[in-house]
Amino acid sequence: MTAPSINFTDERLANGLRLIISEDHLAPVAAVNIWYNVGSKHEVPGKTGFAHLFEHVMFQGSGHVAKTEHMALVQAAGGTMNGTTFLDRTNYFETMPSHQLELALWLEADRMATLLSALNQENLDNQRSVVKNEKRSSYDNRPYGSWFHKLQEYVYPPDHPYHHPTIGSMEDLDAASLDDVAAFFRTYYAPNNAVLSVVGDVEPAQVRRWVERYFGEITASRTIPPLPSFAVSPIIGKETREVVEDRVPLTRHFFGFRAPVMGDPRFDALEVASQILAGGKGSRLYRRLVREDRIAQDVSFFALGLIGGASIAAGQATVVPGVDPAIVEAAFEEELDLLAREPVTDDELARARALIETYELEALQRVDERADRLSSYATLLDDPDMINRQLGRYLAVGAKEIQAVAAEVLRPDNRVVLTYVPAAQAGATTEEPAA
């Protein structure tokens, strides 16, 4: 299978909106994907959770669309839509029959231009309650639900914008006024803070006319503040451990590490290393902990790319009942140490490359994935052509690069270990080894 060359245009409207168009007439489908350069890292102390709150508010109507009708109109036209928020960004997206493309563009423009005219105290209170319920169901009351938030707190220092979770503080949301959240929207949800990608069975000239018609008169934001410094030491500088008593069925270890930023070649090497460690049943961690030693029920390891000073590498292992959790932790860490001590074999490297190549090529077959990646690379790296180069970067990673990044990242003084245990088994809190 050969990687396709994805052709696209990249331009800006007078108000700053970045428009990327990629034409593909293979199927009568079009994807619309808008990324706003706003995530939880843009929030300030005392006003957290606003970016995630708007992920909900954006579906509660705008100036010319009734409450909940954005979703209803898209579904009635045979399309799908959704939105996500994370540390670095927020995105909203539709996949439509190509003859319904104009509807999706109009809906996104109406939200950008007129959302605040439909935002009232009742809507704010309702969506605030929805977010609280989401926090209870997805984090507070879900087994192991707090693990990533705890990693954030340990991997990033308290003054770093990644230290707090995207869902935010419920106290901050309770204290937020209608004026507070409206000011946040006016600041960040503006054409000069957005990338709009349109991919699929489209005519670029017509797309430009529609985008100019619906987005062209929206006023740019003049109040986007500079971000605080993201500078952070490449390593945490100590190992941190916590035993978490929780309503969980089995003991599970989580491991976290500070890692190079997305776009750094070392991050590419870390992603390839993740496949060698935990990419399927032939990976090192699965083969040893699950298949051979039979001490873990499941294992995983992945690298999460971020652009603000440091990314996160993380893994987990669920302990088989009756096995000493210390044995599982030791085996997991031995495999990480081995990756730093000795080069991977040619067979392991070929297998990891094949897994990545298959995943990447399958993903790029879909117009919605192409639209998302174009918006992502433009927003985070200012380089949408990375869509044509990223696979080559992965395939260029060799054994030396993997060994080097493992030695740099997967080291004890850069490690967080969270051990979740069933409530009756807990017997410790936080431990930090003596220097």
Model regions and ranges:
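Glycine-centered hinge/linker elements that transmit conformational signals in sensory
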Residues: 208-224, 340
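Short amphipathic alpha-helices in soluble, non-transmembrane regions
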Residues: 106-111, 209-215, 328-334
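Short pre-active-site segment immediately N-terminal to the catalytic Zn-binding motif
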Residues: 39-47
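Short, glycine/charge-rich beta-strand/loop segments that flank catalytic centers
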Residues: 87-93, 120-133
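Short, polar/flexible loop-turn hinges at active-site or ligand-entry regions and domain interfaces
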Residues: 60-64, 113-122
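Non-catalytic beta-strand/loop surface segments
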Residues: 1-40, 64-100, 138-193, 217-264, ...
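Active-site SXXK
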Residues: 49-62
